[in-house]
Each structure stands twice: as C-alpha cells, then as structure tokens.
Amino acid sequence: MLINKILISIIAVLLPLLVAAQSVSVVRENKQQKFHKQMPAGNYSGVAYLGNNRYAVVDDKSEDDGYYIFNITIDTITGKILTVSDEGFVKTSNGNTDLEGIAYNASQDSVYTIGERNTGIESLTYNEQTHRFWTTTEAPMPEDGMPATPENGLTNRMRLKCYDDNMTLAGEYLYEMDKPTAKSSGRNYVFGVSELCALDDGSVLVLEREFRVARTGIGTWCKCKLYIVNPKTTAVDNVLKKSLLWESKTRLNILSRSLANYEGMCIGPRLSDGRRLLLLIADSQYRHKGVMKDWLKTLVITDR
C-alpha cells in the first residue's frame, strides 16, 4: 500500500508537468502559398504581427533599412491565407545593415529590427505577456565551437538570449541543434537557427533550417524543423530540452519546385476556436532564376 501511495504521489506531481509540456502542439498544417502579384520579390528574413491583419516584414537586401507592411487576411476556421496586399515600405534609415529580425511591442506601438552585419544575429522576437525579447545567432559563437557540416560530424551549440523591456540581458541558455542530415555540403550549405518565436507561457519556438544547394541546382532541398523549448524548466548552465512540433522538407527537382527557405516566423491572430496562427515567410533571393518563390505558410497551434 505504501508503494502504491508513493507511486500515486509521483504521478500527481509529474502529470501537471507532462500536461504543461504538451500544451503547445501543431494541429493543422496548411499548404504553402505564393502571392507574387501582390508582393514584391524579396529576401524576406523576418516578420512581426502588428494586429488587424497587418504584418511588418524585413528584407535583408533592401536598398534602405526598414520594413514592408503587408495586409494578410486569414480564414478564421482553417488558418489558410485568403488575401495579401502591400501597404508600402517604411524606411527607418539610409543604407542596408542586413536586417534579419523584427519584433513589435504593442504597448509601446514600437517596431524593433536587428541586423546581422558584424554580429551574426539572425532572429528577433518579443512577447507582451513575458516582456521579453529573444534572439540568437544563426551559427555557433566562436567560443562554442566550429559550425556543424555534413563532413565534420559536429553539432551546433547556440546561445539563446533574452532581454527585458530595458534591453538588459535577463537570461542566456544553451541550445543544441540536431546533427546535419545531408551527406555532403554540395555547392552551398547553410545550417543553423533561422528564427525564434516567444510564446505567452515563456516557452520559445525555435526554427532549425538546413539548406543544401546541389552542384547542378537540380536536387536542391531545404529542411525545416520547429522545436519548442521552455527555459523555466532548464537550468541556465544546462542545454535546453527541446520537443519537435513540426518538420518539412521542400525540394527543387524535375517534378517539384516547392523549395522554401523559411527565415521569418511570428504568432498571428487567434482563430474562431481559440487556436493561434503561426505564419512563416520564405527568403526567395528575389525569386532567384525564376525557380525560388516568396512562399507563405501557416500552421495552427494550440497554446493553452
């Protein structure tokens, strides 16, 4: 009887933790869509939801720093994108600093951008409930080792950093990527974290991206994996525990031109059933050679 009581007590303690760990999940994946007549060709690298169907989007190769405003309407039942319209470009400064991330603070009605040049920063996200900005580099910092490639057998170890509303460092956490799945680097190979997305409960979505360009072009592919981590359950000096929510592999070959290099990601509006929309946007390198496309994709997630 004593053993049974102990087991029941352990289960009672663990069950809320298990439920909490499983509270975020992807419940619907919509097909990627393109709106080339409504959107200018771009190197879209970050997106932030402004409310009222409006999204701020940065282009890391735009002539000047700033962001586009796209109005994107969503089917409130399925989460599928219905329409896209371009409301113009908001210039913030002269010249280009390779903007990679963008976030929006609704309480201050302020848009924040971050550039990769000289820093390697790849992402930026902000959450109103936690009052935290999150960012990371695309590849490991020098002190954390060499970047992983298909040839060297290494694993990327990243540092996810969070800042409060005053831009004071509030935490730093180690994150370990999966090992590369490509057998060789091909003509070009990019492997790293392309975006983060902060959620209301303090957890963070991490988008891992592996992009292999074949030597002839045909056979190029891009694999994206969406993980969730919760810094609250991991000591600062330990590697974050992660759970896979979704993965996708797009290709460029004779039969398929679905190749999508997703670099931007943000939480959008709630749907009619209370679930949340997650919007992803791809970097097409200005629709490179007519085969790359400015893909948009939506996932529907539960967050409570």
Where in the sequence are the language-model features?
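Bacterial Sec-dependent N-terminal signal peptides
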Residues: 1-23
